[in-house]
Amino acid sequence: MKTYRCRAYIMTLLTLSLVIPGVSAAQSNQDSGRRMSQIDSATSGVHDFDFLVGHWRVHHRKLKERLANSHEWIEFEGTLSSQPLMGGYSNVDDLVLEVPGVPYRGVALRSFDSKTQQWSIWWLDSRRPLGPVDPPMRGTFKDGVGTFYGNDTYNGRPIRARFLWTKITPTSCHWEQAYSPDEGKTWETNWVQDITRVH
């Protein structure tokens, strides 16, 4: 009888030794899956601007006068170089704008917030090298289109500003800026960039 109980006890231990690691492995896989899901969720938008990394030629079109019913456009060329920072959570563009008679340089800095899943964008250029830095534009990408909004002033009046990134391919993309003087009811596009990759 004692021998039978001993054998039964040993068999139980053997069975548990086989089952428990399987349960532990399954639990570990579930935990790992949850962690990966959380990481994916937190970083799902962090690669939105990867398409822009590299060196580009830019054809610019800018309205000569903004919010003045102007239909006269100024066209000029330029360059753009973009690189990622902070492991992809930020990136910076260095732009050369070959405006006839008044060329200048500009810097666009972007930073990704994993909590809100939004990008913030700041602009500074050599016409005002000591600032102030423009108020940030904030937004996201959806269905291949990046849409960003911000509050600003133009000629002393409050406006809403909007950036759009569209027509994104490995070798080209399109950007435009628009202002609204009436809280977004109407928009005037005042700056357009057609961007073509150099390398």
Positions of PLM-derived features:
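N-terminal secretory signal peptides that target proteins for export/translocation
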Residues: 1-6
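Hydrophobic small-molecule pocket/channel-lining residues, especially in calycin-type beta-barrels
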Residues: 25-199
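Bacterial N-terminal signal peptides
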Residues: 9-21
